[in-house]
A protein has these predicted regions:
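Metal-centered catalytic cores of metalloenzymes
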Residues: 1-7, 18, 24, 80, ...
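Acidic/His-rich, divalent-metal-binding segments that scaffold phosphate/diphosphate chemistry
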Residues: 1-50
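Active-site oxyanion-binding pockets that recognize sulfate/phosphate
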Residues: 2-6, 95, 158
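Generic structural signal for well-ordered, non-membrane alpha-helical segments
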Residues: 9-13, 17, 51, 55, ...
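Divalent metal-dependent catalytic cores for phosphoryl transfer on phosphate-bearing substrates
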Residues: 29-141
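C-terminal binding/interaction regions
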Residues: 124, 129-184
Length: 187
């Protein structure tokens, strides 16, 4: 909250944190789940203060806070290959599986929440993969969520897109109550 105050950005950070912890457990990195979660929580630390320099200001901010270079690399790598508003292209590539999951799931969590908000339940818990895929294919839906980045992320992981969609939807459904209770506590 010190750096991102918009409730949407806070919810996004909490969502990515929870999804990253879920993935850590699912992929056999359970002992590192907290670490994966911290990277997810911090990944957009510079977004509100420096939207035109997203991923470029994060290292300085995180170093000032005493965060290690491993976390900084992971945070910056979620923007790999993306040209930000100031014209710079992020050149720090995701290397570890955790960084590749973050790269792939970041944009996708936004698209899944947007799809959930269109549902009568406003929930991911009752969302079927078929419904998500339909929204995903509609380029005008949640247009700010880059399908290209999501697809590149699946490719980096060596996964079919359907696997990424299925797993991230399941992660969000499993974590939804936790995310909502954290958001309620923020109010």
């Amino acid at each position: 909250k010190k750096y991102n105050k918009d409730p949407f950005h806070i919810q996004h950070a909490l969502t990515v944190e929870a999804v990253m912890k879920w993935y850590a457990s699912e992929l056999g990195y359970g002992e590192d789940a907290e670490y994966w979660g911290i990277v997810g929580l911090l990944h957009d630390i510079d977004f509100e203060l420096y939207p035109e320099e997203h991923c470029l200001k994060a290292p300085e901010m995180l170093r000032k806070a005493g965060v290690g270079e491993d976390v900084i690399h992971s945070v910056v790598s979620h923007g790999y290959g993306i040209t930000v508003g100031c014209g710079a292209t992020i050149d720090v590539a995701p290397e570890h599986e955790m960084e590749k999951v973050l790269f792939a799931a970041d944009e996708l969590t936004g698209l899944i929440w947007a799809a959930a908000l269109m549902r009568p339940s406003k929930s991911t818990k009752d969302m079927e993969l078929k419904s998500l895929k339909k929204k995903y294919k509609s380029k005008g839906f949640a247009a700010g969520c880059s399908r290209e980045v999501i697809e590149r992320g699946a490719e980096q992981l060596g996964w079919e897109l359907q696997k990424l969609l299925t797993m991230t939807l399941q992660a969000m459904a499993d974590c939804e109550d936790e995310i909502k209770s954290e958001m309620d506590a923020e109010e």
